[in-house]
Amino acid sequence: MVKLGKKEQQKYRTEGYDLDFISRVQPQGGIKFNEKYIAQGDCYVACLHVYSLAEDIPPLWLTALMNNKDTISSVDVATANKEEVVKDINRSITELKDRMTSERRSTDRDDAHWELQNLTDFARSITQQGEIVKLVKLRIYIYDPVLEQLEKRIGDIKKEIAGQNYKAQVYVFKQKEEWQTLFASYDDQIEYLGVKSGYPLPSKNIGFGIPFHHQDLKDPRGIYLGQTSTGGAFILDPFFSTGTRTSFSGFIFGKMGAGKSTLLKQLEEGLVAKDCFIRGFDKARDYYTVVQQQGGKIIDLSGVQDSEEVETGMINPLEVFATKITNTGAVDEKGSFIQHISKVTNMIRFLNTEFDDTVIQEFRKHLYAFYIEWGLVPQKGSDRPYKVTGYPPNHYPILEDFYKYLSNLKLEAGATPQRHRDLEAIKLQVEDMITVYGDMFNGHTTLKNFENEQIVFFDIDGISKYDKSVFNCQLFTALTLIWSHALKNGRQMKYLREEKNLSIEDVKYFMVFLDECHNVINSQNEFANRYVLEFEREMRKFFAGIFFATQSPQEMLPPPGSTVDVSTMKAIFELTQYKIFLNMDNSVLETLKSVLGESLTESEFRILPELKRGEAIVQVSSTETYNVMFDPDEKQLERFKGGQ
């Protein structure tokens, strides 16, 4: 760095320079102007000069040019001399009229005619409608600590804006002047720096360009999660409804270590503070510390208690929970029972994949008849009210009771030998559930006052070590229980709201968290997929939502070329209101596009692999997308230990 002598310092001070101020703000390490870039002590800089604009300028066009990540943009605007503008237009009109008759190719004559019409309209707006013409200079200053990376970024930005019909270039041997324009007015640039006049534009085009916009999200009753790329607060309430935000579910994608679990815990902690009911599944045991500090419960569905911190409990697979509602918001008893029969049938199907449709039909028939004999379901033609949900746990049969029923069952006369074999196969399967997995399947529900607990997480690590079929059975049972709790809370809140006895601030919401959700929804778990999809559709009316998190769609989708139907999984994603994309690997982008469609722009897809840890593209609605840096404080990170 050059050090000035005393005489030089005195000279500059006499001329009015504040040398102390300059010393504080000057580039540390000095500055050197090279042919195509500027070298500073800590980075390299290049000025990309926009020298040609699109023929048809769209709304918000300046935003696209001046809101590039890690750049500084400048726009210089001056008012053009009206007489000179009109004179230039007249000259151009004369030239275009000549081209309309002299050009040999018809396409060139058509182009000249089109340009003439545009120019004539422009001239009329100036002379008759009071349009004011502005002169505009647009510059994008790109910086990077690595010269090669700077050159790559210049190429990327040029390619991006070229796709919108703008042209830009780094002016060779002009980098010093381009740097100085940052500190000079438009008139000084023209007079002292030898800069050419700006690009003429109607003032209305600048008006709807809106380049210097500021993004923030400040939901009433929201949770502070981080800051937007423009420094605005990002305060999100997933239960806040607007004209474009109509449901309460969300999806989080991001590779390992990108910040998925930390974000979910930020959200969970904020919702707990709002007195929201929380339910979730934890496979990696990431939530133990958080849930314990909040006074919640962790339940191991495997029936094995390997820690004092964890409760074990049985959920009776034959207990009927309320999972269906009518249009008035009441429990649909018959619909809930039919869905319950479907759930138990699928449990049997998963436990024995060799059962064909005939065996399954036989099982369903006997199960339905068993509930009639037990007294829960009225006989056909009976005028007895249909009531199967909401009874105490010991009011329901257990698998052992069903096995006794099957053992005493006599098929009607004339039943085929195949039906007898099917009945024996069903009895054998139920007996296996009782003897081998009795701790999980054979007994009344033992979780007391479970539905009134604010925070409950199911540890599915234990059951994930069992056969896939057993895992699915317990998973579906837990999902049914969660659905029942959400319905009960939602119906109460809905009734109080409709009776105007509860303000929106006092509503108690219900949120389900599915971290590492590929363990639950995937191409091999179609029943769970359909169950979760139905939950999404129904729960919106009852102040409930569900948040999913996984590394990429590849974790859930079948391999390329598979004939497995993935429409249900795509529907689950499409129904989510909030879509959050943390850093993702290049290799999954094509799969992501196949699932997302046009949810993100091409430029947003391209920056996903470049996002820093904790940084995300957040889509709140079809018209609202934010670039957010989530920033939990040190105390939160200490509480969130385990999972990032």
Swiss-Prot record:
ATP binds at G254, K255, M256, G257, A258, G259, K260, S261. This is Uncharacterized protein pXO2-09/BXB0008/GBAA_pXO2_0008. Keywords: ATP-binding, Nucleotide-binding, Plasmid. InterPro entries: P-loop_NTPase, T4SS_component. One of its GO terms (molecular function) is ATP binding. The lineage of its organism: Bacteria, Bacillati, Bacillota, Bacilli, Bacillales. It comes from Bacillus anthracis.
